[in-house]
Amino acid sequence: MGERHMPRFLALLQYTTEGSKVLLKEKVTVRETFARKAIESVGGKVESIYFTASGEYHIAMTAEYPDAAMAAAVIALMVSTGAVSKFNLIELITTSEIDRAYAALTDPVASGS
């Protein structure tokens, strides 16, 4: 995978009953447009938005954000609409980023520290 310039997050969202009713009245793409605009307003970029087959969460969304605070602010905005009752925001790390982090580690036992 190529290098990323912004942190990537997975957001798992659960709709409220009212939020689900709104989805039935308007096209789901209206909600998607809202999410994209909110994320882009803080300098982020949506990578994917999916409905899930999970009973716990209805939406799985991946997006890049300038930082974790911006990601949290967008999720807070979504919750403030009353459409989202529960969320889980997870920062994603690529395998190459982990390899780079592991390479930078110093073993305190081996180094005598």
Regions inferred by a protein language model and the residue ranges of each:
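Short, flexible active-site loop motifs that bind/organize anionic cofactors or intermediates
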Residues: 1, 61, 88
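Short S/T/G/P-rich N-terminal loop/turn motif that feeds into the first structured element of a domain
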Residues: 2-40, 45, 51-56, 96-113
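Short hydrophobic/aromatic beta-strand micro-patches
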Residues: 14, 60-64
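A structural preference for short, hydrophobic beta-strand core positions in alpha/beta folds
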Residues: 48-49, 89
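A short pocket-lining beta-strand/turn micro-motif at the edge of beta-sheets
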Residues: 57-59, 85
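An amphipathic, aromatic/His-enriched active-site/gating alpha helix that lines ligand/cofactor pockets
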Residues: 64-95
